[in-house]
Amino acid sequence: MHDYRAIFLDIDGTLTQPGHSAPPVSAVAAIESARRAGRRVFLCTGRCEAMLKPLLHYADFDGYAASSGGLVVVGSRDVFDCPMTPQEQAHVLTALSDNGVFRTAQTRMGAYCDEGFRDFLRARDVQNGSSELLRWREAIEQRLQMQPMRDYGGEPVYSVVCMSPTREQLDKAMAECSEFDFVLMDDRQHDLVNAETANRRYDKGCGVKQVCAAIGVDPADSICFGDSLNDLPMFGAAGFSVCMGNGGEAAKQSADAVCDSVEAGGLAKAFADFGLLA
């Protein structure tokens, strides 16, 4: 069995259920055991730094690649820091807004959401005769400590999460922002089309390589765990890739192995199966 020296973990749908910040007890125990065995454990996530920090209360990590590789931290040291340029930032935020796409701007200090999104969900709830959508969004915003866009102070943006009422609206915005790629999420939450900007200067795979270079580990001696399309660059960069059982089909087909779901304690079981525990 290969002796993997570095472990990379996606958060949403891998370490935790999507939109949550409390990992299963079994996953925390597995991380602690792997670190006792001398392995380095890193988060590799689309979340900005502020949104991943709640995870740091549950387990010790050796660092993280936040914002899909836009910010890489090893220990207390910034290894890579590459937000959007002011021009890119202004362009993408304006294009999305002009096309009626709701935005969550992710910065190092926090995530800022369009206030109009709640009004949109409230109207959908009235139409559907329930309060499910608004309760769902309010719970996510509270768990992830999101803030309203009116509080955004202009700090550098690393990525923008998009939630569009229709695919047509999102397609128009994407066509106007040719300087970016967009990763479409393969989970349609409440019939909304979800996507995230992808900066062509980096991705999760670059995050893996940056971390490995900083700690002197060959990427071939790393293993990663993910569940969705934005994890594919990470799958390609690490020596071995594992997709969660709850992951999308494209991610499962791209991974070297598939483990049980988050809900079934898949991460801890996979750590044991691949000899990562002390």
Language model segments and positions:
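Short, structured coil segments at secondary-structure junctions
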Residues: 59-60, 68, 176-178, 237-238, ...
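Conserved acidic, metal-coordinating active-site core of Asp-based
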Residues: 106-225
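Mg2+-dependent phosphoryl-transfer enzymes with acidic/Ser/Thr/Gly-rich catalytic loops
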Residues: 2-6, 24, 194-278
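Hydrophobic packing residues within well-ordered alpha-helices of enzyme cores
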Residues: 52-56, 173, 251, 267
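Active-site phosphate-binding/coordination module
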Residues: 22-128
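Short active-site oxyanion
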Residues: 38-42, 61, 158-160, 220-221, ...
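Short hydrophobic/aromatic-enriched beta-strand-loop microsegments
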Residues: 61-69, 182-185, 241-245, 259-261
